[in-house]
């Protein structure tokens, strides 16, 4: 598969066309941003870690019946994916109170919800990715009712699978963000699953092992990312 021209560059990834119309190459960057781009920096080897972690998790989910855009890992920083049209939605699943929901609802960090909380955000940098509900999604024609139902069903299933998986690695999956796209195959899980898009806490120490270390200037950011990679690579 030959890499062609750059199609899109985001905060954490570059997307390239290939010599096959239905496939793209994603290259993961070391650039880090937080608070909708207000804080910027570099996390050494982040791109390598996120590419490898995402590849392992996509393969794991595929084996358990979750269709994804992932095809294979090409290089340390690159993966081959199926071309999809991305829904302009962030699908957030929260198992514990952390981050913005604590400020928004006056919750103490670390409270475990009786059941997972699902939130939608409208992917729009100019608006700051505002939270929306299913009525907004249909009104803005971002997805149909059937598509929303399928996305929710898949998101909860991913949460069920990954929560159990990470617990086996002594990691609590606190919350995470998913994105979905569609092509001729149907709706596929897309984007990435990594310490950039998930909150991971060590089960025994409650130490943060994710991008919150960058957001909150906690230090040892690279070490936390590498620790997640080390654990997911364990058989």
Swiss-Prot record:
Pathway: Purine metabolism; IMP biosynthesis via de novo pathway; 5-amino-1-(5-phospho-D-ribosyl)imidazole-4-carboxamide from 5-amino-1-(5-phospho-D-ribosyl)imidazole-4-carboxylate: step 1/2. Pfam families: SAICAR_synt. It is an enzyme of class 6 (ligase). This is Phosphoribosylaminoimidazole-succinocarboxamide synthase. Belongs to the SAICAR synthetase family. Keywords: ATP-binding, Ligase, Nucleotide-binding, Purine biosynthesis. GO terms for biological process: 'de novo' IMP biosynthetic process; cobalamin biosynthetic process. It catalyses: 5-amino-1-(5-phospho-D-ribosyl)imidazole-4-carboxylate + L-aspartate + ATP = (2S)-2-[5-amino-1-(5-phospho-beta-D-ribosyl)imidazole-4-carboxamido]succinate + ADP + phosphate + 2 H(+). GO terms for molecular function: ATP binding; phosphoribosylaminoimidazolesuccinocarboxamide synthase activity. The lineage of its organism: Bacteria, Bacillati, Bacillota, Clostridia, Thermoanaerobacterales. SUPFAM superfamilies: SAICAR synthase-like. The keyword Transit peptide does not apply. The keyword ATP-binding applies. Its EC number is 6.3.2.6. It comes from Caldanaerobacter subterraneus subsp. tengcongensis (strain DSM 15242 / JCM 11007 / NBRC 100824 / MB4) (Thermoanaerobacter tengcongensis).
């Amino acid at each position: 598969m030959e890499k062609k021209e750059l199609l899109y560059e985001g905060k954490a990834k570059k997307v390239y066309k290939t010599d096959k119309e239905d496939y793209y190459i994603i290259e993961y960057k070391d650039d880090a941003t937080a608070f909708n781009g207000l804080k910027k920096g570099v996390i050494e080897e982040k791109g390598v870690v996120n590419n490898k972690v995402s590849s392992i998790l996509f393969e794991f989910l595929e084996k358990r019946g979750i269709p994804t855009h992932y095809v294979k890992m090409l290089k340390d920083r690159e993966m081959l994916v199926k071309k999809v049209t991305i829904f302009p939605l962030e699908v957030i699943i929260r198992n514990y109170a952390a981050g913005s929901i604590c400020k928004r609802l006056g919750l103490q960090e670390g409270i475990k919800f009786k059941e997972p909380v699902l939130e939608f955000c409208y992917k729009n940098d100019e608006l700051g990715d505002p939270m929306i509900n299913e009525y907004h999604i249909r009104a803005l024609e971002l997805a149909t009712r059937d598509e929303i139902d399928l996305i929710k069903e898949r998101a909860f299933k991913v949460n069920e699978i990954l929560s159990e998986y990470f617990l086996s690695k002594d990691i609590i999956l606190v919350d995470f963000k998913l994105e979905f796209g569609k092509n001729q195959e149907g709706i596929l899980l897309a984007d990435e699953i990594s310490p950039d898009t998930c909150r991971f806490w060590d089960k025994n120490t409650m130490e943060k092992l994710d991008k919150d270390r960058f957001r909150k200037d906690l230090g040892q950011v690279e070490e936390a990312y590498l620790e997640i990679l080390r654990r997911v690579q364990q058989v």
